[in-house]
Each structure stands twice: as structure tokens, then as C-alpha cells.
Amino acid sequence: MSRIGKNPIAIPSGVEVKIDGRLVDVKGPKGNLNVTLPEPITASIENNEILVTRPDDHRNSRSMHGLSRSLVNNLVVGVTEGYTIKMEIFGVGYRVALKGKNLEFSLGYSHPVLIEAPEGITFAVDGTTKLSISGIDKQKVGQVAAVIRRLRKDDPYKGKGIRYEGEQIRRKVGKTGK
């Protein structure tokens, strides 16, 4: 049995879950999300908990069991608490500003870089070097954060770039001159 997949998911008060075949629809105070479970996996509601089960012990069924349980749990957490990723910008002249709902970055290029907020994602800027990305869909929040990080990856020699808050980068020593 999958160690993750066998754990039931508690349904908090204020959250409504509908299961229609393989489609799991979750409504909560922050919005509603849905996911389609992969082929061999099924879900059911018992005693105010969501149970994710697999029909057999085939390799594919075992691998999809834990994944499906995590996807459904992400929906429940997303509609109740939401997800937030915080990022920091390091470097002389590197800054971020909020323009309406979008972000404008100055990252040493000859032009400012504009990132538009996808539906369901909100940006918040603290000062000129800290930003946070919030939303109810964990996958979408993480994807937007990855796109922003890719704009200017951390430089291992000077430490400049965009990184997640608290992330430690491995610094390298430069060449020594003669």
C-alpha cells in the first residue's frame, strides 16, 4: 500500500466535495478547483473524509495512487488556505514594481521585463526587491514562480539574480589573477 495514498483526506468545514466518476470537484471559501484522477484510481467520501483507492497492485496503479491523493489534498488546502511563494531579488539595479496586476522587472537588460498575472494569481511587492505570488492552485503558483526565477537565474560568482526566499545558492570562487 502506498504510504501517502492510504492516508484519508479530512474535509474541513466550509468545503464541499463532489466526486463524479474520476472528476473530483472541491468548493471552498477561496474558490473552486477540480482534478481528473488518472485511469486506475478512484475516490470516495466516507465519514467526512476523502479516500483515494487503487483496484490492484500493478506498477502503474501503485505509482498513481500517492500522486492522486496528493493532487486531491492540494485542492482541499488550496480552497481553504491558498498557496504563497515568496521571492527575493539580489543585484545592483535589479528591482521589481507592480504595474496594475502585472509585474515589471528591471534586471540589467536593455528593456524592462513585464510578467502578466495569469487568472487566479495575485502578485504583491514589498519594497523593490521582494515579491510574493499567491493563488489557490499550487501547480499554477509554482509554475509562475519558476518562470519569474528563470528571468535571471542566480549567478554563482556574484550572487546576483532572482531566488526563492530562504534559498541558499552555492557560491564559487573566481579565478585568481597573476
From Swiss-Prot:
Domain of life, source organism: Bacteria
Q: What is this protein called?
A: Large ribosomal subunit protein uL6
Matching entries from Gene3D superfamilies are given as: Ribosomal protein L6, alpha-beta domain
Q: Its quaternary structure?
A: Part of the 50S ribosomal subunit.
GO molecular function terms here?
A: rRNA binding; structural constituent of ribosome
What family does the database annotate? Belongs to the universal ribosomal protein uL6 family.
The organism of origin for this protein:
Corynebacterium efficiens (strain DSM 44549 / YS-314 / AJ 12310 / JCM 11189 / NBRC 100395)
**Pfam families in the record, alphabetically?**
Ribosomal_L6 (PF00347)
The record's function comment reads: This protein binds to the 23S rRNA, and is important in its secondary structure. It is located near the subunit interface in the base of the L7/L12 stalk, and near the tRNA binding site of the peptidyltransferase center.
| GO CC terms in record | cytosolic large ribosomal subunit
Which of UniProt's keywords are assigned here? Ribonucleoprotein, Ribosomal protein, RNA-binding, rRNA-binding
Q: Which NCBIfam families match?
A: L6_bact
Q: Which PANTHER family match?
A: 60S/50S RIBOSOMAL PROTEIN L6/L9, LARGE RIBOSOMAL SUBUNIT PROTEIN UL6M
The biological process GO terms on file are:
cytoplasmic translation
Signal peptide boundaries: none
